[in-house]
């Protein structure tokens, strides 16, 4: 949620309320989770608190709190500190999203997934310690440039496909891939963030509607059960938006957008190359089983010809 802003005309679907009080699982003696991915607690197991961080400039503002650039004072680790207000989350009934985000993201290790290190809380707030992505939101970059060229878009497609394949192998569906939830690292590499809508699959093949209207697949609009193939549809929409500058089914009316999605009313401007059209058309299929698999996305001729992905050095990214 770095550099988060409300985006029009997109509409975020309201999650179901009534999930009970906020239950962030904490060790009462430490206020910090243990396990993989954490910013290590001091050797004396001192409770983490806001006093352990130097707080810098705000990186973004969201409905439930803000994100700040911060540095852990002892370890000198630069991170993004996401500050969420408990009362606001309880009021909106989204505590389950926080628990889900912590549960899922803390176990994910991939160069194109934003790292979740740790969390702690006080009486009124929950603090999430996240990897800092210095180049911010992809959406801001898209606003700045209008659209991306084939090389940049193909690079993003390879990165997001590799990250999602990793998620799907771990039975995690993201369900909310969109430029606002994709951050950019030091080298401009894509980082999937905001796992609040994610679910473990296949045990939770839900019919609930979530995500952003322009990115919703037909099966979710039509109320059918869905699986990891919703993410295939989303990256097809993402590819189109990166190349064109707006989503493929966007209209001024929600009802008309729904209709265009369910009919897969896909129209390409002349600026979209044949290779990109082929890839997008193979992802934006009404039938989930007909959508191009992630491995085939990474091996698609247009992606192979245009992607400039650079893998990071193979070394531990754990702070010491």
UniProtKB/Swiss-Prot annotation:
The entry lists its GO molecular-function terms as:
ATP binding; protein serine kinase activity; protein serine/threonine kinase activity
Q: Which family does it belong to?
A: Belongs to the protein kinase superfamily. Ser/Thr protein kinase family. Aurora subfamily.
Q: Phenotype upon knockout?
A: Embryos show severe brain necrosis.
Q: How does the record describe its quaternary structure?
A: Component of the chromosomal passenger complex (CPC).
**Does Flavoprotein appear among the keywords?**
no
Reaction catalyzed = L-seryl-[protein] + ATP = O-phospho-L-seryl-[protein] + ADP + H(+); L-threonyl-[protein] + ATP = O-phospho-L-threonyl-[protein] + ADP + H(+)
| Cell compartment(s), UniProt | Nucleus; Chromosome; Chromosome, Centromere; Cytoplasm, Cytoskeleton, Spindle
* Active-site feature positions: 176
Domain Protein kinase span(s) in chain numbering? 53-303
The record's listing under CDD domains reads: STKc_Aurora-B_like
Q: What is this protein called?
A: Aurora kinase B
Return the InterPro entries for the record. Answer: Aur-like, Kinase-like_dom_sf, Prot_kinase_dom, Protein_kinase_ATP_BS, Ser/Thr_kinase_AS
């Amino acid at each position: 949620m770095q550099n988060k802003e409300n985006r029009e005309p997109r509409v975020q679907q309201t999650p179901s309320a009534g999930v009970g009080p906020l239950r962030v699982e904490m060790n009462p003696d430490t206020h910090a989770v243990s396990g993989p991915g954490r910013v290590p607690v001091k050797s004396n197991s001192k409770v983490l608190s806001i006093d352990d961080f130097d707080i810098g400039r705000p990186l973004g503002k969201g409905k439930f709190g803000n994100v700040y650039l911060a540095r852990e004072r002892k370890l000198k680790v630069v991170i993004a500190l996401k500050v969420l207000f408990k009362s606001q989350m309880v009021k909106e009934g989204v505590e389950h999203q926080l628990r889900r985000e912590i549960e899922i993201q803390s176990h994910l290790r991939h160069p194109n997934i934003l790292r979740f290190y740790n969390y702690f809380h006080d009486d009124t707030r929950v603090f999430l310690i996240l990897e800092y992505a210095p180049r911010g939101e992809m959406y801001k970059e898209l606003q700045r440039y209008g659209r991306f060229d084939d090389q940049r878009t193909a690079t993003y497609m390879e990165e997001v496909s590799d990250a999602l394949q990793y998620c799907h192998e771990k039975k995690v569906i993201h369900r909310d891939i969109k430029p606002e939830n994709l951050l950019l690292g030091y080298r401009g590499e894509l980082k999937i963030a905001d796992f609040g809508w994610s679910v473990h699959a296949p045990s939770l093949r839900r019919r609930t509607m979530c995500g952003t209207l322009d990115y919703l697949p037909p099966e979710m609009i039509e109320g059918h059960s869905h699986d990891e193939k919703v993410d295939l549809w989303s990256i097809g929409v993402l590819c189109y938006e990166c190349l064109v500058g707006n989503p493929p089914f966007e209209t001024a009316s929600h009802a008309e957008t729904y209709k265009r999605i369910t009919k897969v009313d896909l129209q390409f401007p002349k600026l979209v190359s044949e290779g990109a059209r082929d890839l997008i058309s193979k992802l934006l299929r009404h039938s989930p089983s007909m959508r191009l698999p992630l491995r085939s996305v990474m091996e698609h001729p247009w992606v192979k010809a245009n992607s400039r992905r650079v893998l990071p050095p193979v070394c531990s990214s754990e702070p010491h």
